[in-house]
UniProtKB/Swiss-Prot annotation:
InterPro entries, sorted: NADH_UbQ_OxRdtase_chain4L/K (IPR001133), NUOK/Mnh_C1-like (IPR039428)
HAMAP family reported for this sequence: NDH1_NuoK (MF_01456)
Annotated GO MF terms: NADH:ubiquinone reductase (non-electrogenic) activity; quinone binding
Annotated source species: Yersinia pestis
EC assignment: 7.1.1.-
Descriptive protein name: NADH-quinone oxidoreductase subunit K
Organism taxonomic ancestry: Bacteria, Pseudomonadati, Pseudomonadota, Gammaproteobacteria, Enterobacterales
Entry's family note: Belongs to the complex I subunit 4L family.
The UniProt record lists the keyword Transmembrane helix: yes
Subcellular localization: Cell inner membrane
Assigned keywords, A-Z: Cell inner membrane, Cell membrane, Membrane, NAD, Quinone, Translocase, Transmembrane, Transmembrane helix, Transport, Ubiquinone
Gene name in the database record: nuoK
Role this protein plays: NDH-1 shuttles electrons from NADH, via FMN and iron-sulfur (Fe-S) centers, to quinones in the respiratory chain. The immediate electron acceptor for the enzyme in this species is believed to be ubiquinone. Couples the redox reaction to proton translocation (for every two electrons transferred, four hydrogen ions are translocated across the cytoplasmic membrane), and thus conserves the redox energy in a proton gradient.
BP GO annotations: ATP synthesis coupled electron transport
GO cellular component: a single term: NADH dehydrogenase complex
């Protein structure tokens, strides 16, 4: 069994990597992928904590997080596809100059 500290450290490292990718990248697709990494890191923390305390709540929260991530990814990819069809770019600087 993996110690609680090791699992939480791994989850924290994954979360920081996702946050770094979200803040540094200028491509909306890579920003969406970084957000998915952050959601999975939080879900991993739930599973590790639930496993440590012998509760099934961690796995239930993981299933909920996966469902949320799937919905977020499908809506985000649909929006990105439409944005790419209209603007022919996914660069955040170009997209932020859109007129209303």
């Amino acid at each position: 069994m993996i110690p609680l500290q090791h699992g939480l450290i791994l989850a924290a490292i994954l979360f920081v990597l996702g946050l770094t990718g979200l803040l540094i990248r200028r491509n909306l697709l890579f920003m969406l992928i970084s957000l998915e990494v952050m959601i999975n890191a939080a879900a991993l923390a739930f599973v590790v904590a639930g496993s440590y305390w012998g509760q099934a709540d961690g796995q239930v929260m993981y299933i909920l997080a996966i469902t949320l991530a799937a919905a977020e990814a499908s809506i985000g990819l649909a929006l990105l596809l439409q944005l790419y069809r209209r603007r022919h770019t996914l660069d955040i600087d170009t997209v932020s100059e859109m007129r209303g």
